[in-house]
């Protein structure tokens, strides 16, 4: 019995270490990379990983259509225990609530390093920071498909170089299209509907599983009048120092009201603790989060 208990404890510790990493991990770097030009180049939205173990990358798109429907899709590549390539989609309107994943073999996918040009089977997302095409083949998604065009109305955004580093481990983010207009077709069971709306596209990549860097994060995008807001807070794990990293961007077509990141005059305020909803062992969660800047924006 004692041998069994010892073996169980050993396996538990081993699995925990395997999942979240070693107990000795570098803290968040005090200075984050700032080597790129403030002007984003289209190669930055191309493939940024090489396929090394633990790397991952995805290209994300969402749109809120004028009829109230919401579409989210993401083209994903991961290199953990094995190489995996897939597309995920969510579509919701008053009649449909669709969530689907489609996996592809390595010989069915292509990626460009010059710009966003991601092909998985007969599906793709491609563009040049200004205009994008997104196609999902109904044959791959149980009769659901899209043929959409996204036209950016704002310049691309990233905080500094868009890279959050802890030692050599990192997670990176580029908001290639902070806001834009969407038009095209939605296909449901052979019926095509012309649609219009507004859309967003970003690109994420890194070289270590996210649970080894973060406990959680919050992310928001929206519009107030002519201004687009992108806000986030990254909550690093205790092994990485336990820091909370806020991000706030507010911009219009010709003006950026604020662009703040990390300790650059931006603060987070939580109110309205949520009680009696989540397990007590969970971290505290709040229904109201405010991002405050030192200049009052």
Task: Kindly label every feature range from the protein language model.
Residues 4-13:
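Sec-dependent N-terminal signal peptides
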Residues 17-297:
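Structured soluble/peripheral alpha/beta segments that form catalytic or ligand/cofactor-binding pockets
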């Amino acid at each position: 019995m004692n041998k069994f208990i010892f073996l169980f404890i050993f396996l538990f510790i081993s699995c925990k270490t395997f999942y979240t990493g070693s107990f000795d991990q570098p803290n968040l770097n005090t200075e984050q990379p700032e080597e790129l030009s403030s002007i984003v180049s289209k190669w930055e939205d191309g493939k940024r990983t090489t396929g090394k173990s633990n790397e991952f990358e995805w290209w994300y798109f969402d749109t809120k259509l004028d009829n109230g429907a919401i579409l989210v899709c993401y083209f994903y590549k991961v290199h953990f225990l094995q190489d995996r390539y897939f597309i995920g989609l969510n579509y919701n309107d008053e009649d449909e609530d669709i969530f689907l994943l489609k996996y592809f073999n390595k010989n069915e996918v292509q990626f460009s390093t010059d710009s966003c040009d991601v092909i998985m089977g007969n599906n793709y997302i491609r563009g040049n920071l200004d205009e994008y095409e997104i196609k999902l083949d109904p044959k791959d998604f149980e009769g659901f498909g899209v043929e959409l065009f996204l036209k950016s109305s704002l310049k691309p955004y990233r905080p500094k170089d868009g890279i959050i580093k802890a030692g050599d481990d990192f997670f990176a983010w580029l908001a290639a299209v902070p806001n834009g207009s969407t038009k095209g077709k939605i296909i449901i069971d052979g019926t095509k509907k012309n649609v219009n709306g507004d859309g967003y596209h970003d690109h994420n990549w890194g070289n270590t599983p996210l649970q080894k860097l973060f406990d959680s994060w919050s992310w928001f995008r929206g519009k107030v009048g002519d201004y687009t807001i992108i806000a986030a807070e990254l909550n690093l794990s205790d092994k990485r120092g336990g820091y909370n990293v806020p991000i706030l961007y507010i911009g219009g077509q010709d003006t950026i009201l604020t662009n703040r990141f990390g300790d650059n005059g931006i603060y987070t305020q939580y109110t309205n603790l949520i009680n009696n909803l989540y397990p007590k062992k969970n971290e505290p969660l709040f229904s109201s989060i405010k991002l405050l800047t030192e200049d009052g924006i």
